């Protein structure tokens, strides 16, 4: 047992604060992080948040003889208080210490110092990392320049850009020389000569001077040389800048794209691009580059970056007829993205997913879970953006076999999720599971042992349909982890917007003519292995329809007689399809007993005028057409033709273009009245992991 003396001795071993703020929250150590002409930055500690911060201290006597400097300091503090951006240094608080005649303000601390120090420390940096830094700096500048009136930094350089190396993020700081452009032009000549634009010397400039300084920062990042280092006096720099002579370091840049980008930043003010325009420059469009893993590289990063796909391709498999059994380089494949090894070695691999000019804060990610009586856990991940697009992803979680990181990685691999970090989703899963199971211990999601092998059939870089197609293909039948595929059910809807049109681009009616139908009371939602039919109702009410609601009593079948000669048993295949549909309906009814299917059928029978033929695709070879529901007897016309079921036989490897034509295209702007939601979803039993799944399902609306 430790006595008071022992406690005092232990406390004496701890480093003592050199200074404490008036509230007692922040304590300053004597460790100096940086020192300038009039400001010293110390290491400090936030006792409330339990994190290290930067204690900026300025001596007041340094400004007593210079009111302009004092005003500039107050300007910096005021700006830091009002600016809130992920690429601008965070400001916490400030105060004046009258007794010590100091002005103190607390900002976030950067673990890796300035960008110049960080770049000199890490000499071997791929050009894609430089692009990533450039996008972040431009994003911060765009935020400053978008104010009304605009805010210009006026002293942007690598010494005023700070880095958190463990996250690869850079932020703009040291806004002491920043000015609010209250008029059309600023009228002061301030800054660092090597980074000052020619118009600054003429004291007639606008926010584009920051773009000129940014170009010099890029030049320093790629050459490790300070701009105009060949000059020995500021006057020499002034003469070169005024005459339009570029620094010699620019001509040492061998990459033509880098050099061209820097020249755009250093152009004359009338031709210089803005931060918004530079963010759209092809040089910085790293997200449009194709990601191709190297030889045998199947690490976690393969999931973090997926190629960008057009909206029309988001719900369709991109696998071609030459689906390979592996992704080894020596195996010829037609579905793999084309990448040359020389390009990979020269440009590296893009590990930075998401658009840097679109803050992740605009995307709201929440998770909710439920634990059943038998101990099984079912989770819902909700992803919503500012445009009202909502994605609900439902999946079971096995606390004995699953880890949060492995489930998150599998989710990114199967679903079209490219804008969210795997680690962030994994942390949310860990937190929710820990709340449901107090004894749960988070662990790593990937076993980093030599015996652990990566399943080549799991790594689909295309879309959720692509992963499902690969799973159901012959190449994946022997896959050891194939039972994990299809665990996710995704429901998407629009929180607000215009009316949604459902188009059938590939189906044909009974008369053979392909027509486009606008479905106003139902919406088809694609997911991995299931079909959900949307009905009229508010977005906060959810329901799942079953295949039993689909009438499966065909009057007669039409098919090619040549199939019989090939040994194709049509009756057997139809019976199997009907059995699978009924089986799926029973499972749905058992899993979600709280759903009022009778009431739902009643609502659909009331809409007899909208009795459409639906099409669902089971497997790779057969396409059946079934009616959505049976009309009430009073609603049928005497002259109406009987429902016809058309059956078409497809080849073993269907054309991806034909598959895309059969998918319904949903307009991006959806009506709230047409939203598909899930009512009382968590009141049902948990979804078993061994639930039978169809291979792929599509819904098309055609004329009845």
Swiss-Prot record:
Signal peptide positions (record): none
Keyword annotations: ATP-binding, Kinase, Nucleotide-binding, Serine/threonine-protein kinase, Transferase
Induction (free text): By fungal elicitor.
SUPFAM superfamilies: Protein kinase-like (PK-like)
Catalytic activity as recorded in UniProt: L-seryl-[protein] + ATP = O-phospho-L-seryl-[protein] + ADP + H(+); L-threonyl-[protein] + ATP = O-phospho-L-threonyl-[protein] + ADP + H(+)
Cited Pfam families: Pkinase
Region named Disordered: 499-519
Residues annotated as binding ATP: 107-110, 157
Active-site residues annotated for this sequence: 174 (proton acceptor)
Taxonomy, superkingdom: Eukaryota
Similarity section: Belongs to the protein kinase superfamily. Ser/Thr protein kinase family. WNK subfamily.
Name of the protein in its database record: Probable serine/threonine-protein kinase WNK1
Organism classification: Eukaryota, Viridiplantae, Streptophyta, Embryophyta, Tracheophyta
Gene name in the database record: WNK1
